[in-house]
Design a protein with these regions (language model features):
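Conserved core segment of the aminotransferase class I/II
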Residues: 1-5
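Flexible, glycine-rich terminal cap/loop adjacent to redox cofactors
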Residues: 6-8, 12, 19, 24-145
Length: 145
């Protein structure tokens, strides 16, 4: 069905915004989806930006490559943009590009198991910390005895 649709309506089948790209520098710079500025222009202040520095990653520390970070932009709990500055960022961005395309949120992404120790465990750590922080923001809903 997609092949026929794309044949008659080229460009309609793929969401170009979620297509990842990478600049192969040292460290690599990879991106998918919206930048923070684009997300704020489209969604206003209903945007959250989450950051995980590689200084907290065991593999990066072991390799001596702690310069870098993973940044994820969300709107209404869904990932709308991702940026990675890290060794092998071009290999790690695919997970976040798929999350953008499929409308996955950080809480769902936090359930994914990453191989340890790899730099990509920082994606899981970012997702877990973001989900935990979001849950903490709702703690006022819970009645205490």
């Amino acid at each position: 069905v997609r092949a026929v649709r794309d044949m008659f309506f080229p460009g309609k089948g793929k969401v170009v915004a979620s297509v990842p790209w990478c600049t192969f520098t040292d460290p690599e710079l990879a991106h998918a989806g919206m930048t923070e500025a684009e997300a704020r222009a489209q969604h206003g202040d209903d945007v959250d930006v989450w950051r995980q520095d590689l200084a907290h990653n065991d593999r990066a520390r072991a390799d001596g490559t702690t310069a870098g970070a993973i940044i994820v932009i969300t709107h209404k709990k869904r990932i709308v943009g991702a940026h990675i500055l890290a060794p092998a960022a071009g290999e790690m961005i695919h997970e976040l590009a798929l999350a953008i395309e499929e409308g996955v949120g950080l809480s769902e992404l936090s359930q994914f198991t990453h191989v340890y120790p790899t730099v990509s465990t920082s994606i899981g750590r970012l997702a877990g910390e973001a989900a935990f922080e979001k849950a903490g923001r709702l703690s006022w809903l819970v009645k205490r005895r």
